[in-house]
């Protein structure tokens, strides 16, 4: 049996591998715990999270993403809305939100919802772009039309600088224990160029009003990947060189990343 398309794409990914490393590197213990994943997209993160143990429920906004995730991991995949988390108060031991909150127009009420379904003392993990204006990577995004004010990536905002993320979580009942960043300039720059190339190709055959939640910047189904089959073969052939380009980030370890992860626990007295 051929490998699922999500895993095929992951094998040739750049930023996704860094995201997965950051996610699994900061994931709290999950064995024997009930865990909620928000922002499962097409199920790639769900696949790896479930390998870590625990019982996972995974959610996303997009119907097509939910359908793809179900094909990959089969069960406990739920389509949600943008205003509430449809579970009982204190239902989960762990809540993980993966590059998800920046898409929510009214983010603070949604944070309260995420905290509500977490048990007191439960573990919380948030991943998001940092969205720091004035940096070279941000200037590249603006040039390519990927900033939030240009409706890039379907974002309601460009992201959360670590201090802003910490403040948002703490005023809603999460005691933040730490933050970290990942994905430095060379990886971010190349990922944006690849997203732009895919976006241009996708939009030539699709009405812009039919764009999906992620703004059509990467394949979000097996059918979408098949439609760019020749281009993907070229990309695969160039992948070793592209991967080598991203390794330049190791030469500038003092340069902070463009993505962030924050983790903490729900206060015992939080609602």
Where are these regions (language model features)?
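Acceptor-substrate binding/catalytic loop of class I
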Residues: 147-164, 182-184
